[in-house]
Regions:
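Generic signal for short, ordered secondary-structure residues
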Residues: 4-7, 22, 44
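C-terminal structural segments of small proteins and small subunits
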Residues: 40-72
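Thiotemplate assembly-line natural product biosynthesis machinery
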Residues: 1-17, 71-72
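Phosphopantetheine carrier-protein modules
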Residues: 11-30, 47-58
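Generic non-transmembrane alpha-helix signal with a bias for helix starts/N-cap capping motifs
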Residues: 1-2, 37, 62
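Phosphopantetheine-attachment site and its flanking helix in carrier
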Residues: 27-45
Length: 72
């Protein structure tokens, strides 16, 4: 999980100490539809998973995203 949180912090350009698995994606100051798409694309590349847009729209927190990756 920590590796994932470090990766998410890098994508969002924040310090890893500022986030944890309960962090909502809406908490990021740069959050918007383009950032959501960027995050999904980065996750798909790094973790070699496919996240359909319907599923991506349901992901609301880092924990949701991590759980999705683990289930894939």
């Amino acid at each position: 999980m920590q590796d994932f949180l470090n990766f998410a912090a890098e994508v969002f350009e924040v310090d890893p100490s500022e986030i944890d698995e309960t962090t909502s994606l809406n908490e990021f100051y740069k959050w918007g539809s383009l950032m959501h798409l960027k995050l999904i694309m980065e996750i798909e590349e790094k973790y070699e998973v496919d996240i359909p847009l319907d599923d991506a729209a349901k992901i609301k927190s880092l924990k949701d995203l991590y759980s999705y990756i683990q289930a894939s």
